[in-house]
Amino acid sequence: MGKYFGTDGVRGEANVELTPELAFKLGRFGGYVLSQHETGRPKVFVARDTRISGEMLESALVAGLLSVGIEVYKLGVLATPGVSYLVRTENASAGVMISASHNPALDNGIKFFGGDGFKLDDAREAEIEALLDAAEDTLPRPSAEGLGTLVDYPEGLRKYEKFLVTTGLDLGGMKVALDAANGAAAVSARNIFLDLNAEIAVIGDQPDGLNINAGVGSTHPEQLQALVRESGSAIGLAFDGDSDRLIAVDENGDIVDGDKVMYIIGKYLSQKGELAKNTIVTTVMSNLGFHKALDREGINKAVTAVGDRYVVEEMRKNGYNLGGEQSGHVIIMDYNTTGDGQLTAIQLTKVMVETGKSLSELAAEVTIYPQKLVNIRVENSMKDKAMDVPAIAAIIEKMEAEMAGNGRILVRPSGTEPLLRVMAEAPTDDEVNYYVDTIADVVRAEIGLD
């Protein structure tokens, strides 16, 4: 990660940290870097979610791009994966998404995609950061025909919707409950599932600029659970603010998280011989029950660090086509290059139609183990050295021996804070509490600050 670019672009409180001035510079410097690696005038797609700050930042970003001669196509409100899709299929040089995903309305972010639809590579981000840190802006200032042009491109949304519909099956009147998180999916999810011949009930589709992710969406599925029960829906589908993740709800109103969604889609692809290398890419935070279910099906796993960027890196490196996270980021590389909540939702309903099984039946094959996570404050200098402390290493070894393979312990440093995270999974709540609390007590005694 750089000074400005984190794992998911540049983020911060809108108009405080992520200011119009910074957005202008990101557009200007980002556009210039793109132009240095292109022949001809670069073409860039720009989209945003529904945050009140989106239009402010969009205006500044677009002005910056135009100031260095970029041809800008303004997509309006669109899901992050929609930008990725359009960049690839319409031969754009890059795409920019203005969103802070599942964060509250006061935050926003700016994320660049390369012409291949993947996140802009680290080398390009470093070039942009170097310009941001320069003492003065010495870039060319073209005039007249050298300036960029702006094209409003609302048809991009419908092209993305049509693409998504082609990946699904006729749902034959299936009752589907949707939660668009008052975000980007509010402009598309309804249309997509109506085109798939679903009978729909919708919440979270009235964005006002301030209510994105507020009590709705994939991080707050409670309203959707109630809607599924009240409406008698066969499935509930909750997206986040930029629709790059999905949390599902079965017909009983129970949560079906990213692990279960990946298992259901992965098993379906495996049985059809379409799961690349018969492998699913997941992170160290995936539940042990998910791993055991894959083992029963003979499906392989590739495990990465936490973060969808690491999942995507592993998929690209080894040619895998399915991966994701427990949080609902699911990447189906046969169709798109990034997590896509609406695409994942369509594939989930496709499995239901083709198997004739309810979502609860499909999800029941994964027994989710109780999981507990405790954060312990430590010195930054110690969080990467915890396993070098003999007492900590010994207690972890002792607890793992007691588990005898029927549980899991993960002790890892936070990537951004002076914290050590202690996580365990076991068959019962009592067991998981015992394992985590025992290890946490030793960690606190040896290196804890509290």
Swiss-Prot record:
GO terms for molecular function: magnesium ion binding; phosphoglucosamine mutase activity; phosphomannomutase activity. Gene3D superfamilies: Alpha-D-Glucose-1,6-Bisphosphate, subunit A, domain 3 (3.40.120.10), Alpha-D-phosphohexomutase, C-terminal domain (3.30.310.50). Its cofactor is Mg(2+). Mg(2+) binds at S101, D240, D242, D244. The active site is at S101. Its EC number is 5.4.2.10. Catalyzes the conversion of glucosamine-6-phosphate to glucosamine-1-phosphate. SUPFAM superfamilies: Phosphoglucomutase, C-terminal domain, Phosphoglucomutase, first 3 domains. This is Phosphoglucosamine mutase. Belongs to the phosphohexose mutase family. InterPro entries: A-D-PHexomutase_a/b/a-I, A-D-PHexomutase_a/b/a-I/II/III, A-D-PHexomutase_a/b/a-II, A-D-PHexomutase_a/b/a-III, A-D-PHexomutase_C, A-D-PHexomutase_C_sf, A-D-PHexomutase_CS, Alpha-D-phosphohexomutase_SF. It catalyses: alpha-D-glucosamine 1-phosphate = D-glucosamine 6-phosphate.
